[in-house]
């Protein structure tokens, strides 16, 4: 089974999903779960039409033998957790200023790879703390 990498971001009150496969496939939506469904439909349409145009598409892809690997940009990741995790809690475990986290959430700024890793590790740390509750 082939894994298709999909980059997900958040900007202008919408999630966006982009994958480069025999061109570019794009979908947008306000809701993350709906975005995934819309993207899957757009990808299937793209593959079908590309094959009709004579583009070389592997048989495994034409048969639907693929999965999507969604890689969330920090703007999308933070937006998903906005309202669930406070910026104060995330700031406490990451050491990143709440205001800066807000800029990342809104897509105003893009974190350096080290900052992204701090945020992901902070979310994991909070998750472990929640799991430790008996």
What are these regions (language model features)?
Residues 122-129:
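Residue cluster at the C-terminal edge of the helix-turn-helix DNA-binding motif
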